[in-house]
């Protein structure tokens, strides 16, 4: 028959709780008197609650600078920031060193030494390499064969002999009918129409291939007399015409292209304003033959050019 006195064994859960309490007691006993990893278990006076924040500190030891700052986070807790810098000494020119000692002004008046990101932009360093003339000659680039073709005249207009296509000639509507009418009057064939009388043939300057010195008496044209000494210089006045009602934008080249189909031109004089350099509205054209000048008067007088009607007549001979 069971009695009230019996040995009750502790349960497994009770044994676990007792072992945990014993472990906590042992751990707390072992940690007493053992310093932390920092060497000091107490808070610094600057980090105590209620103490004011000290100013930043800078300690320079050789080429190592240590900056210590104290701040307060969002939760109101104080914390310390320690930054370590390595000081490097760089050599600079006198002008750069002098500029660094200038007093700051404006928004950077109270900034510490050094650039401020808000007001200063530090660009990348640009390295320059200086070479001598000998190295420059050795590094010359190869000549482009296309550059040689730039100076050559590949396309030639049949009307004004310009460097453009005939269909795009700006004088197609003015000089074209005049050349056609002149060719019909002279009775030229189709092949000869391209070379009307008076057109200037391209003259290429003869170059001395040997490179030797040639005296003036043996050069080309040495046997010819000067223009002022020619006896037929007076005849130019008889083959000179006067053109009026020209626009202000007219140039000698325009007159050359306009009157060249009628014959060989000896000289052109365009009256210009000394201040503006624009045309005064009249010009003198001298031909080598009087017949060419007569054809020019008949062909151009009353002709519309640059929105104006040209008036061409014989020029009065000079009294000199």
Curated annotation (Swiss-Prot):
GO terms for cellular component: eukaryotic 43S preinitiation complex; eukaryotic 48S preinitiation complex; eukaryotic translation initiation factor 3 complex; nucleus; perinuclear region of cytoplasm. SMART domains: RRM (SM00360). The gene is EIF3G. Phosphorylated. Phosphorylation is enhanced upon serum stimulation. Belongs to the eIF-3 subunit G family. InterPro entries: eIF3_g (IPR017334), eIF3g_N (IPR024675), eIF3G_RRM (IPR034240), Nucleotide-bd_a/b_plait_sf (IPR012677), RBD_domain_sf (IPR035979), RRM_dom (IPR000504). It comes from the Eukaryota. Component of the eukaryotic translation initiation factor 3 (eIF-3) complex, which is composed of 13 subunits: EIF3A, EIF3B, EIF3C, EIF3D, EIF3E, EIF3F, EIF3G, EIF3H, EIF3I, EIF3J, EIF3K, EIF3L and EIF3M. The eIF-3 complex appears to include 3 stable modules: module A is composed of EIF3A, EIF3B, EIF3G and EIF3I; module B is composed of EIF3F, EIF3H, and EIF3M; and module C is composed of EIF3C, EIF3D, EIF3E, EIF3K and EIF3L. EIF3C of module C binds EIF3B of module A and EIF3H of module B, thereby linking the three modules. EIF3J is a labile subunit that binds to the eIF-3 complex via EIF3B. The keyword Protein biosynthesis applies. GO terms for molecular function: RNA binding; translation initiation factor activity. This is Eukaryotic translation initiation factor 3 subunit G. RNA-binding component of the eukaryotic translation initiation factor 3 (eIF-3) complex, which is required for several steps in the initiation of protein synthesis. The eIF-3 complex associates with the 40S ribosome and facilitates the recruitment of eIF-1, eIF-1A, eIF-2:GTP:methionyl-tRNAi and eIF-5 to form the 43S pre-initiation complex (43S PIC). The eIF-3 complex stimulates mRNA recruitment to the 43S PIC and scanning of the mRNA for AUG recognition.
